[in-house]
């Protein structure tokens, strides 16, 4: 799916996104929370936050997503329309950066992951669809850019807990 069609796709399905994906995303979120320590004082960035299903952490959260119609359905107080490849934040801003089932949609996977690393302070959770045609590329760049502390597979995704 080319990038323009992909962006339009998420705007088109925005009204039914949660019905399609809520249960699946909440399972991933539960697994992430079991393995990720977050303090109330932490600042967390959710890259590819969509409607905010994966954003409910007990800390300060900012979400970023390119699909405006998904963001309109997101209840986060702080949300930004934007892309992973051009994160509008200073270096080392976020205590935690997560990206749940979004990496396979990045226009430039390497650049998006480099940006995630740049804005984070050292705690990252990265997941992507394990059936993605870009799987080998994504894994290669995650291994080049981050230090992997834990790798897990669940029903549909591969999860990396990194620093």
Model-found features: residue ranges?
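Conserved beta-strand signature within the Rossmann-like core of class I S-adenosyl-L-methionine
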Residues: 122-130
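Core SAM-dependent methyltransferase catalytic element
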Residues: 153-163
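A short glycine-rich, Lys/Arg-flanked "PGG" loop and its adjoining helix->strand segment in the class I
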Residues: 110-123
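Short alpha-helix
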Residues: 132-145, 158
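Class I SAM-dependent methyltransferase SAM/SAH-binding core
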Residues: 45-86
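Short catalytic micro-motifs in class I SAM-dependent methyltransferases
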Residues: 101-102
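Conserved class I S-adenosyl-L-methionine
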Residues: 1-37, 155
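A conserved beta-strand element that flanks and buttresses the S-adenosyl-L-methionine
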Residues: 98
